[in-house]
Amino acid sequence: MDIEKIEDLKKFVASCEENPSILLKPELSFFKDFIESFGGKIKKDKMGYEKMKSEDSTEEKSDEEEEDEEEEEEEEEDDDPEKLELIKEEAVECPPLAPIIEGELSEEQIEEICKLKEEAVDLVENKKYEEALEKYNKIISFGNPSAMIYTKRASILLNLKRPKACIRDCTEALNLNVDSANAYKIRAKAYRYLGKWEFAHADMEQGQKIDYDENLWDMQKLIQEKYKKIYEKRRYKINKEEEKQRLKREKELKKKLAAKKKAEKMYKENNKRENYDSDSSDSSYSEPDFSGDFPGGMPGGMPGMPGGMGGMGGMPGMPGGFPGMPGGMPGGMPGGMGGMPGMPGGMPGGMGGMPGMPGGMPDLNSPEMKELFNNPQFFQMMQNMMSNPDLINKYASDPKYKNIFENLKNSDLGGMMGEKPKP
């Protein structure tokens, strides 16, 4: 074997001797089981155990550890010197109960019973309990015994350390007389020797309530102390279980709240992502490209209407405004739409008819046209002038719209209205 390992083992054993509570750690349970398998017993060092307990306070105890602690507490209670007086239930059969008979006892039987009672009392005084028991068994065999007879035999059975039979006779006595104080007290003694402190406490309290006996005070005090310990221990277990359940419910509630919060967060993130995607798709819109549409105007134009349509009178001319549109549309594009002859006379001071479109429709892809269409003020201005022609002079003299008018004159629309576009 490795000498260094042996030295380490010696040091470990020495530390265990100084503080045996080390062996109570879960990781050393195998070593603790090994020691106990050879009959060894590990006792807690209170200071060391409390210190170790405080160090591991953040760790939760398992159910097995709690059960081990409870078993150790019970073992410590078993070492109580007061419990050395406890006796075990007897294995022998209980003495027979009285037979069921009809009618009343004869005078001879009554005389015999009285004689047996006197003999039994003398035997009890001389502590000849076995012989006294035989006398009471014979008395009960006649039938119809009183509650007192059963109580007397129960007292003898208790002296013979037969608590089970004693309890049975006391119960029979109470069935005959529920107010028999002696039956309660004797049965309380039997329960006390069996270590059934709760039953002993109930019977002793009831017996002393009916007929108080100061000679039983010491036993009554012992029973009360034991009962109090049992009650407190049971109350402690109940409170501990309730606290355990409460912590469990709180833990489950925290999990549910955390899951709910996480779900809400994911829901908000998904909505935010969907809104972002929607905004991105809307911002991807672009203006239509007119490239390739009607290059150089519509070739050939529309065939003219025979005779042409009478020209519409122009809009009333404004001083400094656009020149009047002369007569109707001329032939326009070759083979195109016939000019619309102007209305004779037109409106006084009005604008002449719209001249024909030389070369067809205006080129929508020209720089001037694109600049006009990209200017929102142009559409607003045109809409306002169509609803109120008097605004033409206002827009023409407004420096804000000067550039629009320049582009309009240079565009094909300006040519349509009599302006010559700049080359």
Swiss-Prot record:
Keyword Cytoplasm in annotation: yes
Species of origin: Plasmodium berghei
Gene3D superfamilies, alphabetized: 1.10.260.100, 6.10.250.3420, Tetratricopeptide repeat domain
Entry GO CC: cytoplasm
Repeat positions for TPR: 113-146, 147-180, 181-214
Any single biological process term in GO: chaperone cofactor-dependent protein refolding
Biased composition (Basic and acidic residues): 46-60, 264-276
Compartment list: Cytoplasm
Compositional bias of kind Acidic residues: 61-82
Region ranges (19 X 3-4 AA approximate repeats): 292-362
SUPFAM superfamilies: TPR-like (SSF48452)
Keyword set includes DNA-binding: no
GO molecular function, one term: protein dimerization activity
Protein name as it appears in the record: 58 kDa phosphoprotein
